[in-house]
């Protein structure tokens, strides 16, 4: 069954993670798992060039995200405009945990305003206190109702945060969910049925997780075959089609 991946990285993560993947390795993995195209970002705000190189080396395989750090101020905003307008990037990646800011902090406003002006989505890491909690992401969605926000990991590994991700997405129609790293397969079905059949996306978070692990969560979620196809493919296809130039 063909798939689209809503979240993956290219590059090396050192320290505790100790994982890495090249663009070539990622494409090989995609081919093996029938993943046609991937929403791709680098490892941080200092190596967006890796995403650009992957997009150039493998045309039509990636939607590129600008990994942005709002604490870098105007430098980050200008990089967003440059990569979106001149290098065909399709959105923004934020990680409040990595860069140590709260997900609804005012320092995000210039980045969110850029997303609104450029008509691009924002993908944001969720699930870790105190920076990346679903309630804070919901406040950001409330402040920018005309910017679509994808809550990566939909609360991640904590049951309370997973539940909050679903509750907040039900409250704010511009919040979407991506399920990589989230361990509860039943919550994929719950999101499909209660948040919206088109607002839950399959993702891998490569190289942190192998696609087959994430695939099994969708396959065993209790969804029908048609619904599984939505999560694996149609939902992200429809979502990203809004932003095609």
Predicted regions and their residues:
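Hydrophobic faces of well-ordered beta-strands that scaffold small-molecule active sites
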Residues: 4-8, 38-40, 63-66, 90-94, ...
């Amino acid at each position: 069954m063909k798939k689209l991946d809503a979240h993956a990285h290219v590059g090396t993560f050192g320290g505790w993670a100790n994982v890495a993947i090249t663009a070539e390795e990622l494409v090989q993995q995609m081919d093996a798992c029938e993943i046609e195209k991937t929403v791709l970002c680098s490892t941080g705000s200092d190596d967006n060039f890796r995403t650009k190189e992957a997009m150039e080396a493998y045309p039509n395989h990636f939607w590129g995200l600008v990994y942005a750090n709002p604490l870098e101020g105007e430098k980050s905003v200008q990089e967003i405009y440059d990569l979106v307008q001149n290098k065909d990037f399709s959105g923004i990646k934020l990680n409040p945990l990595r860069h140590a800011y709260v997900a609804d902090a005012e320092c995000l406003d210039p980045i969110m305003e850029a997303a609104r002006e450029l008509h691009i989505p924002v993908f944001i890491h969720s699930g870790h206190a105190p920076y990346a909690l679903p309630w804070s992401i919901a406040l950001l969605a409330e402040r920018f109702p005309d910017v679509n926000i994808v809550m990566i990991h939909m609360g991640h590994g904590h049951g309370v945060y997973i539940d909050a991700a679903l509750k907040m997405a039900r409250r704010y129609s511009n919040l979407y969910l991506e399920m990589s790293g989230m361990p509860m397969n039943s919550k994929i079905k719950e999101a499909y049925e209660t948040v919206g059949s088109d607002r839950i996306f399959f993702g891998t978070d490569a190289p942190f997780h192998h696609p087959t692990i994430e695939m099994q969560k969708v396959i065993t979620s209790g969804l029908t075959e048609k619904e599984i196809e939505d999560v694996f493919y149609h939902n992200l296809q429809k979502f990203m089609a809004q932003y095609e130039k």
